[in-house]
UniProtKB/Swiss-Prot annotation:
Biased composition (Polar residues): 492-501
UniProt keyword annotation of Cytoplasm present: no
Gene: Tcf7l1
Domain of life: Eukaryota
Name this protein carries in UniProt: Transcription factor 7-like 1
Species whose genome carries this gene: Mus musculus (Mouse)
Length: 584
């Protein structure tokens, strides 16, 4: 940061109110109309020196002049936060004023000021500068910038996010500072230009039409200088970018950087590229869209918007293979049908019918063809030999004439066709019947299942609780099981006892005693499976008054622990018909 000297180093400019500073040596850093960028390198607080009064006064004047020069910048109480974004505006102010002067004599060249009022000029840093890599701004404002028009991204101004305290390019050194708004711009939107023109993508604005001159309105061929190339790049490809003049003036052998909208993956959907504009670039200016650099990631499949909209060429029909080129039976049959049907020559009777038919129809009131043919047949047989000989002679001449006209004709042709049609019809009918029978057989085989007679097992202990379907096999009630959580539920073998075992509680208790070790291992599994699968027989627990005395009192041979665990299962497994009877 330039240090301020002891005395006044600079004076405010005329109308602009710009300040000029001086170093300790007293050398001027620039003219009176230039601004001095003050930048804090590491964020340390400035230590007050001995000559605080004069230095603080000079600093206050410079700060006030800078605030007056900046647009839409609110003053802050924190001087550190107010000075930090200031060099970015100063650094962009210089090249903007410089290019404003350069653009006046070059109104007909690359940069036109009034043609695109909705899209401001974009500051592109000179990538050949040695100060592009990580680090602060180049000292002394030696960094050069290149302006570009950016009509390829259209986002309404209401959808953009503006930040009045956007960081300087020094803090964005790890990113590509491709587009920087001159005054305020959110760091997350480096590729959006701010426009107040609200138009739908379906109807592009008039300043994007390449066929009409925006000044004269006369259709003209587009000029390559009026369409700015677009420049979406990843941060890792900064070192591989050539001089920016290569984008504006494409030369042979110099790569250009153009990625399709599908390859430009940005986390914010507002930055999506207009597909119509990208297709406009690729279709009308193919020399400006060259293959991408090998270091850049490219998508394997081209986006449909990038493909040049030339006239669609239908793919040529593939050459027919010999199998396809051979005449199929259908085509042969059609050709045979197209051939004219050659009738056989008329015999003597047919010639007589042809001659006498009109007379018979006029004499008779019958209109049926069969009746007329019968009448003609009777008349033919009534004729004498001489009269019939005349028609036989006519028939012979008819055959000779037919043989001259159709020398290769044979009567088998017509009859063969009829027989062939009949055979094809019969074959088609038999094939259809076979297909119907096969389909019906397949459906019948799928629907039918082998019937296996279900026989209950002989051993009652191996049969499931639901095999007999009687009331004796129903599980215990859940209410009785909940009454004593310490007592295990009735197990598989206890619930499946036949009538002879369930009528004797003593024998039932002895069976439970002998199988206690085996039942304890299966108690939990059978309890969970049977309680959820079968409905209980009793809806409420039985009162103790209806229980027999022999069931309520356990035999003296049982230990106390066995009585606690086995008494309730014995009571739970008794059906209602057996519990109400008294024990013998």
């Amino acid at each position: 940061m330039p240090q301020l000297g002891g005395g006044r180093g600079g004076a405010g400019g005329g109308g602009g109110g710009s300040g000029a500073g001086a170093t300790s040596g007293g050398d001027d850093l620039g003219a009176n109309d230039e601004l001095i960028p003050f930048q804090d390198e590491g964020g340390e607080e400035q230590e007050p020196s001995s000559d605080t009064a004069s230095a603080q006064r000079d600093l206050d004047e410079v700060k006030s002049s800078l605030v007056n020069e900046s647009e839409n910048q609110s003053s802050s109480s924190d001087s550190e936060a107010e000075r930090r974004p200031q060099p970015a505006r100063d650094a962009f102010q210089k090249p903007r004023d410089y290019f404003a002067e350069v653009r006046r004599p070059q109104d007909g060249a690359f940069f036109k000021g009034g043609a695109y009022p909705g899209y401001p000029f974009l500051m592109i840093p000179d990538l050949s500068s040695p100060y592009l890599s990580n680090g602060p701004l180049s000292p002394g404002g030696a960094r050069t910038y290149l302006q570009m028009k950016w009509p390829l991204l259209d986002v309404p101004s209401s959808a953009t996010v503006k930040d009045t305290r956007s960081p300087s390019p020094a803090h964005l050194s790890n990113k590509v500072p491709v587009v920087q708004h001159p005054h305020h711009m959110h760091p997350l939107t480096p590729l959006i230009t701010y426009s107040n023109d609200h138009f739908s993508p379906a109807s592009p604005p008039t300043h994007l039409s390449p066929e009409i001159d925006p000044k004269t309105g006369i259709p003209r061929p587009p000029h390559p200088s009026e369409l700015s190339p677009y420049y979406p790049l990843s941060p890792g490809a900064v070192g591989q970018i050539p001089h920016p003049l290569g984008w504006l003036v494409p030369q042979q052998g110099q790569p250009m950087y153009s990625l399709p909208p599908g390859g430009f993956r940005h986390p914010y959907p507002a930055l999506a590229m207009n597909a119509s504009m990208s297709s406009l670039v690729s279709s009308r200016f193919p020399h400006m869209v060259a293959p991408a650099h090998p270091g850049l990631p490219t998508s394997g499949i081209p986006h449909p918007a990038i493909v040049s909209p030339i006239v669609k060429q239908e793919p040529a029909a593939p050459s027919l293979s010999p199998a396809v080129s051979a005449k199929s039976p259908v085509t042969v049959k059609k050709e045979e049908e197209k051939k004219p049907h050659v009738k056989k020559p008329l015999n003597a009777f047919m010639l007589y019918m042809k001659e006498m038919r009109a007379k018979v129809v006029a004499e008779c009131t019958l209109k049926e063809s069969a009746a007329i043919n019968q009448i003609l047949g009777r008349k033919w047989h009534n004729l004498s030999r001489e009269e019939q000989a005349k028609y036989y002679e006519l028939a012979r001449k008819e055959r000779q004439l037919h043989a001259q006209l159709y020398p290769t004709w044979s009567a088998r042709d017509n009859y063969g066709k009829k027989k062939k049609r009949k055979r094809e019809k019969q074959l088609s009918q038999t094939q259809s019947q076979q297909q119907i029978q096969e389909a019906e057989g397949a459906l019948a085989s799928k629907s039918k299942k082998p019937c296996i007679q279900y026989l209950p097992p002989e051993k009652p202990c191996d049969s499931p609780a639901s095999s007999h379907g009687s009331a004796l096999d129903s599980p215990a009630t859940p209410s009785a099981a909940l009454a004593s959580p310490a007592a295990p539920a009735a197990t598989h073998s206890e619930q499946a006892q036949p009538l002879s075992l369930t009528t004797k509680p003593e024998a039932r208790a002895q069976l439970a005693l002998h199988s206690a070790a085996f039942l304890s291992a299966k108690a939990a599994a059978s309890n969970s499976s049977q309680m959820g699968s079968q409905p209980p027989l009793l809806s409420r627990p039985l009162p103790l008054g209806s229980m027999p005395a022999a069931l309520l009192t356990s035999p003296p041979t049982f230990p106390a622990t066995l009585h606690a665990h086995q008494a309730l299962p014995v009571l739970q497994a008794q059906p209602l018909s057996l519990v109400t009877k008294s024990a013998h």
